């Protein structure tokens, strides 16, 4: 098996020396390919992301990703162990001297996209996952970071303990809320199905609220099993949003009338509100979605406010929802802007910034820092300058969790002194709940659900059961016809659509399921229409290619992968849509 893994590594161009063995394909990140491997030194399974540094632009994006992931340390964020160069060498702050970089990170069993492909989650599972997603977003946003690519494929799940972790920060961006970043933000990064209306209208001007819109779309998808707004292109995406999300503010109405008047109803009434679009979702969840999926980002809940909503009350615990103690500042964003300008000339110009580069690459989460050197969360008691700047819509400086931080003499000292098992109000209504908590490293994860974890006790047996014939889902029919200008486009797209598109790489093994049946009653897995990865075929063809490396054309890997996956007619449309989302 080790020889097969080494062959796979050579086929994909992985050169990490002999430390990592048993490579297996996992998928593709935004900036590179991802393989699983076994770290023989640490004796653990890891995921290794390869980033090719082919030019100044790719190097700039790699530096930004490494800078961000090295500083983020949270239970609901995929942990990064180290960043290596060719042959497993240490980068030592000299990224610009290498042609490739490897990010060694925590291995996660599956992702949310794979789980959703197997069927609708129970509401209990959806609520638990949404809580952890907001818990991770609260920390990310407090660090002045935008993820910018939240979608089920970038949300990873451990089916053993139901822990959710946010991953793939290849498109993440540092944004200091006290300064205007207008003109320096990239266009259209979020996958269009999870793209907010503000991002569709003004792709260069957005805030942390774009992540919250994506989170709301993901919650609706978990509750219903299908994408909330599955537009074939940006025009249809905006049309679907306007059919469901009300436009309240006058400035938004004026902009829509100026930009796309044919798509706007004269009465500004929505055709299918969320309560009608999602008839099987309970009223409390609908209220939660209505507060997240607002047309204007100023009216949208923040991650911290979402954690305090009644829908999250079974898990809400402000004392166990930490924020970043070392957020990124405007200086970090300026470094990126300077590097962007420097990359336009030549790579050697980057030698002018060795300090900022090496400090970001050599930072460790456990590094000791003096309290005076740590910048507090800028949202806690800070007052923005009264200048003409873009104001972040997080107008919640007096929220309960921030008052908790301000009243404590030190948030770090409070974290060490607090006994979470006794001081936290878990609001679960069960006197024995604390006795069932999942403990790790002498502290509980208060959001762990023993009952839901028990529901997974038979997923391995169910995964080995013979699959039943899959029943193709009928496409969702529309009740109303689109606007006149949109009709021709919709008719053209209709011929290529066979259902809701989903952009996710094909699995290479049977994926674990979240069983909805009680413990002791495993649920058989329904056979899906997703393509299956044949490892034996892949290995045999890979060995043939390895014997003739000089004859390997650039597109040979695509032919190899295609030969190992069974084709389905519907996959062609999905593949085309998925490739367009990776721009």
UniProtKB/Swiss-Prot annotation:
InterPro entries: Kinase-like_dom_sf (IPR011009), MAP_kinase (IPR050117), MAPK_ERK3/4 (IPR008350), Prot_kinase_dom (IPR000719), Protein_kinase_ATP_BS (IPR017441), Ser/Thr_kinase_AS (IPR008271). It holds the Pfam family Pkinase. The modification Phosphoserine is found at residues 186, 430. The gene is Mapk4. Its cofactor is Mg(2+). Atypical MAPK protein. Phosphorylates microtubule-associated protein 2 (MAP2) and MAPKAPK5. The precise role of the complex formed with MAPKAPK5 is still unclear, but the complex follows a complex set of phosphorylation events: upon interaction with atypical MAPKAPK5, ERK4/MAPK4 is phosphorylated at Ser-186 and then mediates phosphorylation and activation of MAPKAPK5, which in turn phosphorylates ERK4/MAPK4. May promote entry in the cell cycle. Residues 366-410, 495-531 are annotated as: Disordered. The active site is at 149 (proton acceptor). It is found in: Cytoplasm; Nucleus. This is Mitogen-activated protein kinase 4. It catalyses: L-seryl-[protein] + ATP = O-phospho-L-seryl-[protein] + ADP + H(+); L-threonyl-[protein] + ATP = O-phospho-L-threonyl-[protein] + ADP + H(+). Changing residue 328 to A/Y: Impairs binding to MAPKAPK5. A motif (SEG motif) lies at residues 186-188.
């Amino acid at each position: 098996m080790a020889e097969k893994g080494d062959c796979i590594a050579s086929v994909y161009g992985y050169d990490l020396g002999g430390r990592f063995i048993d490579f297996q394909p996992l998928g593709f990140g935004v900036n590179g390919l991802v393989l699983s491997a076994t770290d023989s030194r640490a004796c653990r399974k890891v995921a290794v992301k390869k980033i090719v540094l082919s030019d100044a632009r790719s190097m700039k994006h790699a530096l930004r990703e490494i800078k961000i992931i090295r500083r983020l340390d949270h239970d609901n964020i995929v942990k990064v162990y180290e960043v290596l160069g060719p042959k497993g060498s240490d980068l030592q702050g000299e990224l610009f001297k290498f042609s490739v970089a490897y990010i060694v990170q925590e291995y996660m069993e599956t992702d949310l996209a794979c789980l959703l492909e197997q069927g609708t989650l129970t509401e209990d599972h959806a609520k638990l996952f949404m809580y952890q997603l907001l818990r991770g977003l609260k920390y990310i946003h407090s660090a002045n970071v935008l993820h910018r690519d939240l979608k089920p494929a970038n949300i990873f799940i451990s089916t053993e303990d139901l822990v959710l972790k946010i991953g793939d920060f290849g498109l993440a961006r540092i944004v200091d809320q006290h300064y205007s970043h207008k003109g320096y933000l990239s266009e259209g990064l979020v996958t269009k199905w999870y793209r907010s209306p503000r991002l569709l209208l003004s792709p260069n001007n957005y805030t942390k609220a774009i992540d919250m819109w994506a989170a709301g779309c993901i919650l609706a998808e978990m509750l219903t099993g299908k994408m909330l707004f599955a537009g074939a292109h940006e025009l249809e995406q905006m049309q679907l949003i306007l059919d469901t999300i009300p436009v309240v503010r006058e400035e938004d109405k004026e902009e829509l009338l100026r930009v796309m008047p044919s798509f706007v109803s004269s009465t500004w009434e929505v055709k299918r509100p969320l309560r009608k679009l999602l008839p099987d979702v309970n009223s409390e969840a609908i209220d939660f979605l209505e507060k997240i999926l607002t047309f204007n980002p100023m009216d949208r809940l923040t991650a911290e406010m979402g954690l305090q909503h009644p829908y999250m009350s079974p898990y809400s615990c402000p004392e166990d929802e930490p924020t970043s103690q070392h957020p990124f500042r405007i200086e970090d964003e300026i470094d990126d802007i300077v590097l962007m300008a420097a990359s336009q000339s030549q790579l050697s110009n980057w030698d002018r910034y060795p300090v900022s580069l090496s400090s970001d690459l050599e930072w460790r989460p456990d590094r000791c820092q003096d309290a005076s050197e740590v910048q507090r969360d800028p949202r806690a008691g800070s007052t923005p300058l009264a200048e003409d700047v873009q104001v972040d819509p997080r107008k919640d400086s007096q929220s309960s969790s921030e008052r908790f931080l301000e009243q404590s003499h030190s948030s770090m000292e409070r974290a060490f002194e607090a006994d979470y098992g006794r001081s936290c109000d878990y609001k679960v209504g069960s006197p024995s709940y604390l006795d069932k908590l999942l403990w790790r490293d002498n502290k509980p994860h208060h959001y762990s659900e023993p009952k839901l974890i028990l529901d997974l006790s038979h997923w391995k047996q169910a995964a080995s059961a013979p699959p039943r014939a899959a029943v193709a889902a009928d496409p969702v029919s529309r009740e109303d016809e689109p606007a006149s200008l949109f009709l021709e486009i919709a008719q053209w797209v209709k011929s290529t659509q066979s259902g809701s598109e989903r952009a996710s790489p094909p699995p290479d093994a049977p994926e674990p399921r979240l069983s909805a049946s009680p413990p002791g009653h495993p649920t058989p897995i329904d056979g899906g229409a997703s393509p299956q990865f044949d490892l034996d075929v892949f290995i045999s063809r890979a060995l043939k290619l390895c014997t003739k490396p000089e004859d390997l054309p650039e597109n040979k890997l695509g032919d190899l992968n295609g030969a190992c996956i069974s084709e389905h007619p519907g996959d062609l449309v999905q593949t085309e849509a998925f490739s367009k989302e990776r721009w």
